[in-house]
Regions:
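A contiguous, surface-oriented mixed alpha/beta subdomain in the mid-to-C-terminal portion of proteins
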Residues: 163-191
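Short, well-ordered alpha-helical packing segments
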Residues: 12, 19, 23, 101, ...
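Glycine-rich, often proline-containing surface loops adjacent to acidic residues and nearby aromatics
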Residues: 96-98, 127-135, 185-191
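Compact, glycine/acidic-enriched structural inserts
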Residues: 124-169
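Hydrophobic/aromatic-lined pockets within catalytic cores
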Residues: 23, 27-31, 108, 119-122, ...
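Internal mixed beta-strand/loop scaffold within catalytic domains of large alpha/beta enzymes
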Residues: 54-130
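Gly/Pro-rich turn-and-neighbor structural signature
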Residues: 3-87
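A short small-residue
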Residues: 1-3, 190-191
């Protein structure tokens, strides 16, 4: 097995394991025993059904109005429109990507909504990408300011363990990614 194929297999398995752990932990907050419902899907382009797919996991409970923990592994040709815009795509015959997306909306107005996604992408190059943000109901409350400071301090600590000075680079990317141009504002407390 080629090294890149091993990386693909490991990352895809890791995302599935992570999804299972996140679902198990969130279900513990549901006092009436509500569980995630899972549904598989296929990426169907022009009726081929051979371009990967994933599994949606959705929980509607008493604690969480809606929580989604979704995984996917997709692949296929790179469109001419995207050739050269994605690292490694100029020479690649196609792409492969596997990832997880988590979106949680609690019922309590005191608990913010949270979004997180991460993925492993393979073209002529390969890398991990992703981001996270939180959105409280009242962005300007003193609790939201404390929450924003805590959230960003935790992210900074994680990033700095990975590579010194990387937090601000990644924060700027997330702030751009999570910007809502139609509202001319960042989503939530920034990424």
């Amino acid at each position: 097995m080629k090294k890149i194929d091993q990386k693909k297999k490991l990352s895809s398995e890791w995302f599935r394991e992570l999804r299972n752990k996140i679902c198990q932990e969130l279900e513990k907050f549901e006092v009436t025993g509500k569980k995630f419902r899972k549904k598989k899907w296929n990426r169907d382009v022009k009726g081929t059904n051979k371009l990967g797919g994933g599994e949606m996991s959705v929980l509607r409970g008493e604690t969480f109005e809606k929580a989604g923990v979704n995984i996917s592994t997709v692949f296929g040709p790179i469109s001419q429109e995207l050739k050269g815009k994605i690292p490694g795509s100029k020479t690649a015959k196609g792409f492969w990507a596997s990832g997880i997306s988590v979106v949680i909306h609690p019922y309590s107005p005191k608990i913010p909504a949270i979004h997180m996604n991460t993925r492993f992408i393979v073209t002529g190059k390969n890398w991990f990408g992703g981001g996270t943000d939180i959105t409280p109901n009242n962005l300007n409350s003193s609790n939201s300011i404390k929450l924003a400071n805590y959230f960003h301090n935790e992210l900074k600590e994680i990033c700095e363990k990975y590579k010194k000075g990387s937090y601000y680079k990644y924060k700027n990317w997330c702030d751009e990614y999570f910007f809502l141009p139609h509202r001319n504002e960042p989503r939530g407390l920034g990424g």
